[in-house]
């Protein structure tokens, strides 16, 4: 695979029709080559065809925040944008939170999502998530749904682009969460949901 002028992907395939019949913005060239527009939808379709196309986030996103991302953080953010459901098994201390924030910010910029719910342990709602959102996406509105039930509900029903809530808090206001307009959910330390017999998992 070759990136052409930062706009298109040049593929060499045994069966070019395999791609050109499902991607309108593609063109068959000579010698089993296919030129595909490098957009989010095209990259996702290529991924579904087992062609490892890079995420357009690597081309067009202005990495926000106080710190420049490492290459592995860019790769992780790209992975998140290419997969509607994903798990991240990167080692502790590798900047997974920042990668998730950048991916969410990119999807917000593209209009693919409108609102993000972050579910995490109570102990890191402020110290990690709120602080990291202010560090890496200071232009986004953030609120923490914590405290009395009515207070949590009011925050969820508000207009913050990122809402942070702890695991048990989801159960307290589950109806508000379901109606909150969240189209991206980030679960930090998802192992807390590993047992399907628990209320938390359900």
Language model features with spans:
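Charged, low-complexity intrinsically disordered regions
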Residues: 1-53, 110
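SF2 helicase/translocase NTPase motor core
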Residues: 18-29, 51-78, 82-85, 94-202
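The Walker A (P-loop) glycine that initiates the GxxxxGKT/S ATP-binding motif of P-loop NTPases
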Residues: 90
């Amino acid at each position: 695979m070759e990136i052409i002028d930062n706009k298109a992907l040049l593929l060499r395939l045994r069966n070019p029709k395999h791609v050109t019949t499902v991607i309108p913005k593609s063109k068959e060239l000579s010698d089993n080559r296919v030129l595909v527009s490098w957009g989010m939808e095209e990259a996702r379709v290529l991924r579904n065809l087992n062609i490892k196309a890079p995420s357009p986030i690597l081309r067009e996103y202005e990495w926000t925040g106080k710190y420049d991302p490492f290459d592995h953080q860019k790769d992780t953010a790209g992975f998140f944008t290419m997969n509607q459901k994903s798990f991240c098994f990167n080692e502790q201390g590798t900047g997974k939170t920042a990668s998730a924030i950048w991916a969410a910010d990119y999807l917000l910029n593209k209009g693919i999502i409108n609102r993000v719910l972050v579910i995490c342990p109570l102990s890191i709602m402020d110290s990690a998530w709120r602080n990291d959102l202010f560090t890496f996406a200071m232009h986004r509105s953030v609120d923490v749904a914590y405290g009395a039930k009515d207070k949590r509900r009011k925050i969820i029903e508000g207009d913050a682009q990122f809402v942070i809530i702890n695991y048990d808090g989801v159960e307290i206001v589950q109806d508000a969460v379901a109606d909150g307009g969240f189209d991206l959910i980030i679960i930090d330390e998802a192992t807390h949901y590993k047992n399907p017999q628990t209320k938390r998992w359900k």
